[in-house]
Curated annotation (Swiss-Prot):
Gene: dsbI
SUPFAM superfamilies, per database record: DsbB-like
HAMAP family cross-referenced by the UniProt entry: DsbI
Protein's name in the database: Protein-disulfide oxidoreductase DsbI
GO molecular function: protein-disulfide reductase activity
UniProt keyword Cell cycle, yes or no: no
Subunit composition and interactions: Interacts with DsbL.
Gene Ontology biological-process entries: protein folding
Record-stated family: Belongs to the DsbB family. DsbI subfamily.
């Protein structure tokens, strides 16, 4: 508690210098890499493999954006005081968060369209492909199909358990929970915050933090001149 109070006291007293000092430490960069890497592992290992929620085209694009941020965080964490490494990390983090927001917004629009009672809501909505085209034409679906090959339909993320599969009691509980809510929600019984919205929140928070940190760094460099 005293540690947190100390951080808050430093931030209030010298905000720019404190923010610059924070980004010159490995903690924040590793935190970003671990957080985004953890979300990728959670989506793949728990929801896709354990609960049989097949990823759609936009889902694997979101994973790509998170993976870029993981790489950026790791590169910057090698030596955050090195301007080149930190700049590479910042560019990768900004790119990943912006692209992630873009993919999440598109998936959210598709989700609302397919779950809308009005059939006209689907008019003009582009469907999902099982043959993704990643930025820079990266063949991620060929390199790591388990992680980046879409096998589901956009907007439909309820568990689909293959015939003949025997579920454990824990699996059955989660599968029933998400099937009854007709998809993934942060709070399934109340349909609160679908997967696309949760991803938007994660990317948005990262983007805000990056903007604040980069702004402080730019001010520090400007003052140094």
């Amino acid at each position: 508690m005293d540690f947190i109070k100390g951080l808050w006291r430093d931030l209030r007293a010298r905000p720019v210098d404190t923010l610059v000092r924070w980004q010159e430490q490995r903690f924040l960069w590793l935190l970003m890499a671990i957080a985004m890497g953890g979300l990728i592992i959670l989506a793949h290992s728990f929801f896709q493999i354990y609960l049989y929620m097949a990823p759609c085209e936009q889902c694997v694009y979101i994973r790509y954006a998170m993976f870029v941020m993981v790489i950026g965080g790791v590169i910057a964490a090698i030596n955050p005081k090195n301007i080149v490494l930190k700049l590479i990390g910042c560019i990768a983090a900004f790119y990943g968060s912006i692209m992630g927001i873009k993919f999440s917004i598109k998936l959210n629009g598709i989700h609302h369209a397919v779950h809308n009672a009005d059939p006209d809501s689907l008019f003009g909505v582009q469907g999902c492909s099982t043959d993704p085209t990643f930025p820079f034409n990266l063949p991620l679906a060929e390199w790591a199909p388990e992680w980046f090959k879409p096998t589901g339909d956009c907007g439909y993320d309820a568990p689909i358990v293959p015939d003949g599969v025997t579920l454990s009691s824990v699996q059955q509980w989660f599968v029933d929970l998400y099937q009854q809510s007709e998809g993934w929600y942060l709070l399934p019984p109340w349909h609160f915050m679908n997967m696309a919205q949760a991803c938007m929140l994660a990317f948005g928070l990262c983007l805000i933090l990056l903007l604040v940190m980069s702004g402080a760094w730019a001010l520090k460099l400007a003052r140094g001149k």
